[in-house]
Regions:
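Short, structured patches in soluble enzyme cores that scaffold and shape functional sites
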Residues: 154, 175-177, 220-222, 260-262
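Terminal catalytic/cofactor-binding subdomain
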Residues: 1-153, 160-161, 167, 187-202, ...
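E2/UBC-UEV (E2-variant) core
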Residues: 207-224
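Hydrophobic/aromatic-rich, well-ordered segments within soluble, folded domains that form packed cores
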Residues: 150, 162-183
């Protein structure tokens, strides 16, 4: 086959971003905070949000954009949510996402420190505009909801596959794709991929019932999905959300909004999930590459999604078109296409990150096929939990590698005798954002993880390194990555420079529009940027240069 035109190699990198909703847990009540009780505690989060690195001149009525180009806000269900800035690689997105997690950790510590010392909030927030919030905060500190703990997971403790009222919060992925790509093609190619991606992208979740005892699901979000595609997010949840808010020139770009994914604790799992998705989207964007391939969807895709989720043997059979597959074999089908596209036909340039992602994807599927749980445990959350829980129950002779539906009557009886509450506590504490209490963080420091990481790195040397350094997080905390986040950062610099000369009445920041008003009686000056790769626009540059050099 002839190589494609060379201009295929000049395509801009895909814009990738994530939105992570965090869960608030009442230490006093020992339960997740109920959104219905939100009015009792939500006023305190004006103070909670003030701990994030955001422009001070925009307080208190502010949309939550940060110095690093990301955004923090209170979302549906009163979950604090962090959105990364527009990133140009999966690795960058993971680093900026992790910076947001550490911001949440800092905010939790500050909020609970204020509970112990009520003067702290008054000292920290000296702006008179916050008097009312401080008073409300102090008044409610002794209420039943504090101390608050923050978790990075997606399900309440009470949610089971049979629960009629699902309670879940999301981790959402965003990918830029050309608007010329039809949704029907995206659905056809991507839905089977998303159904099986939970093999390595799931964060695991322990469930139980009174017949078979506890069992481990590969992922959390599949338990609450109802549709393959729709415009909803909180009811009748789809894998792909079709409500198109491109935050860009809509005639050129679509923002593909994926809500099936889990909020991983492992940056390696998160990276593989984002990178593999972006690589498969590269195939979708190519007009000719997938021509002639059969992507006929499996029967009952949502049922299949949940069946795979509950199968820790990774062997659930299903048809895609005429071919019989398992989740592993279907992921290999996509991986083979990506390898041919990048490494054989060289239709686009394979950067080092892309080559690493392809190699890791293949090595992970190889290990899953061998059922090498320990090797994957340092890198994938669901395998870490499988390893942890099997270690705890090893004296019983049982294993969570056997799904509940395959257990004998004697095995079911033994599983029912396992102290579920102890296991479930570890399951939940795996997702603590406070690192000194996080089971994930503690597990990463075990000898097993060190040994298996060393073993895996003999095949893939880049796995010997930590995914990110302290310097990476420090940069991602304060500075935007390449792209439009730097344009918003330049606007903040402009507004703060003016504010040092004369107080600014108000500013407003959104993804593609910034608003500036010097005095109350003035009209707004608007700055617009519909290009997520663009770091500066001419109108903002002229304003910024004027104040920089005046």
């Amino acid at each position: 086959m002839a190589k494609p035109p060379s201009d295929r190699k000049d395509i801009k990198p895909r814009i990738i971003g994530t939105e992570t909703e965090y869960a608030l847990f009442s230490g006093m009540q020992n339960m997740f905070l109920d959104p219905k009780a939100a009015p009792t505690y939500i006023s305190n989060f004006h103070i909670f949000l003030e701990t994030f690195p955001r422009p001070s001149l925009a307080r208190p009525n502010y949309t939550g954009f940060l110095y690093n180009g990301g955004r923090v806000y209170i979302d549906t269900g009163f979950h604090p949510e962090y959105a990364t800035p527009e990133c140009q690689s999966a690795r960058t997105a993971v680093i900026y996402e992790r910076a947001g997690q550490y911001m949440m950790e800092q905010a939790e510590e500050f909020l609970n420190a204020c509970m112990r010392n009520q003067d702290l909030a008054r000292e920290y927030l000296s702006d008179p505009a916050f008097d009312a919030y401080r008073d409300a905060f102090a008044e409610k500190l002794n209420k039943k909801y504090f101390p608050v703990r923050i978790f990075r997971n997606n399900m309440t403790l009470e949610t089971l596959p049979t629960t009629p009222d699902y309670v879940s919060w999301g981790f959402h992925e965003n990918y830029s794709i050309p608007s010329r790509i039809e949704l029907a093609k995206i659905e056809k190619v991507m839905i089977p991929f998303f159904i099986t991606r939970q093999l390595y992208g799931g964060s695991g979740w322990l469930i139980t019932n009174n017949k078979t005892g506890p069992s481990l699901c590969l992922a959390q979000r599949p338990l609450v999905m109802q549709l393959t595609m729709s415009s909803g997010t909180t009811s009748n949840r789809p894998l792909i959300n079709t409500r198109d808010e491109p935050h860009a020139a809509g005639d050129l770009l679509r923002r593909l909004h994926i809500i099936i994914g889990d909020a991983n604790m492992s940056p390696w799992a998160q990276w593989l999930k984002l990178a593999a998705t972006s690589l498969v989207l590269d195939l979708v964007e190519d007009e000719m590459f997938l021509e002639g391939l059969d992507f006929s969807p499996p029967n009952n895709p949502i049922t299949l999604l949940r069946d795979i989720c509950k199968d820790t043997t990774f062997s659930t059979p299903f048809f895609m078109g005429p071919k019989l597959h398992t989740a592993v074999s279907l992921q290999r089908f996509y991986l083979d296409l990506v390898q041919r596209y990048y490494l054989v036909e060289e239709r686009r340039e394979a950067t080092q990150e892309i080559r690493n992602a392809i190699a890791f994807w293949q090595a992970v599927l190889d290990a899953i096929e061998r059922s090498d749980i320990a090797l994957l445990a340092p890198f994938l959350d669901n395998f870490a939990k499988l390893c942890l829980f099997d270690t705890i129950i090893q004296e019983t002779g049982l294993s969570f590698k056997k799904p509940a539906h395959d257990r004998s009557s004697s095995e079911r009886k033994k599983f029912l005798e396992i102290p579920f509450d102890r296991l479930k506590s570890l399951d939940l504490m795996y997702h603590r954002v406070l690192r000194r209490e996080s089971v994930y963080a503690k597990f990463q420091n075990t000898s097993l993880c060190r040994e298996e990481r060393k073993k895996f790195s003999t095949r893939l040397p880049f796995l010997a390194n930590e995914f990110f350094t302290d310097a990476d997080i420090e940069t991602a905390w304060w500075y935007p990555p390449e792209g439009r986040g730097r344009w918003r950062g330049a606007f903040i610099e402009f507004a703060e420079t003016i504010n040092r000369i004369e107080p600014v009445f108000s500013i407003g920041i959104d993804w593609s529009i910034c608003r500036f008003r010097q005095r109350e009686q003035d009209s707004d000056t608007l700055f617009k940027n519909d290009d997520p790769w663009c770091e500066m626009t001419a109108d903002l540059k002229s304003k910024l240069d004027a104040v920089r050099y005046s």
